[in-house]
Amino acid sequence: MEHIKKKMLAMKLDKENAVDEADQLEAKLREKELEMQTKDEEVAEVLKKIQQVDTDKETAQTQLAETNTKLEETDKRATEAEAEVASLQKRIRQLEDELESTETRLQEATVKLEEASKAADESDRGRKVLENRTFADEERINQLEEQLKESTFMAEDADRKYDEAARKLAITEVELERAESRLEAAESKITELEEELRIVGNNVKSLEISEQEAAQREEAYEENIRDLTERLKAAEDRAQESERLVNTLQADADRLEDELVTEKEKYKALSEELDSTFAELTGN
């Protein structure tokens, strides 16, 4: 009986020890569960931060692409404006050359007209005093005819020079068309490069990066956007300045064309007056 009591007492102690150990294990389990819950919350927070960084990165990439597009468009406008400025400057030089040539022809025609007028005056006086000098009169007529031939030759030479200038202008227009063709080819190449850039952008999006690397890229994108924004502003200023210069040059070209038309009309009037004078001198 005493042995049974000892055994029951031992079993009771074992039970109490087992209960204590179970309580300790349950406490440790609860601690582990709390620790796991905390870890899960930390992981969720990190994932949330990574997701936010990815969102910020995509936004930065979108802004970068838009800024690049605006910059390319502005550069294109500036390049086109500069090309138009060069074309207008070349056209102005051509107009100035034509105007100078026309003024020279006008001066020559004026001199010839003055000579013809003097010759006409001399002829009038000569007819009064040389009625009985037929040979001298005929010689004078021959001289006037030679002068007429010379004036006609000069007028034809001036016409040839004008035709040559027109031919050069036509050649210049052909070269301009070729330049436009090269510009179209360049625009096609730009389109191809934009497509390659889009493909590269898609590949970049597919890369998995850590939170620290994503933050560094986001900072780099923002710095690039600020740089591109400054370049975009500078390019827009340059494009506006080029547009103002184009307007000024266009006004100069219009003015020179008007002056050229006026000089041509003066030359035509003088030529007609010269022809009329020679016709009167020759009695036609």
Curated annotation (Swiss-Prot):
Coiled-coil region(s): 1-284
One Pfam family matching this protein: Tropomyosin
Region entry Disordered, spans: 56-78
Function: Tropomyosin, in association with the troponin complex, plays a central role in the calcium dependent regulation of muscle contraction.
Entry remark concerning the domains of this protein: The molecule is in a coiled coil structure that is formed by 2 polypeptide chains. The sequence exhibits a prominent seven-residues periodicity.
PANTHER family reported for this sequence: TROPOMYOSIN
Entry protein name: Tropomyosin-2
Species name: Schistosoma mansoni
Upper lineage: Eukaryota, Metazoa, Spiralia, Lophotrochozoa, Platyhelminthes
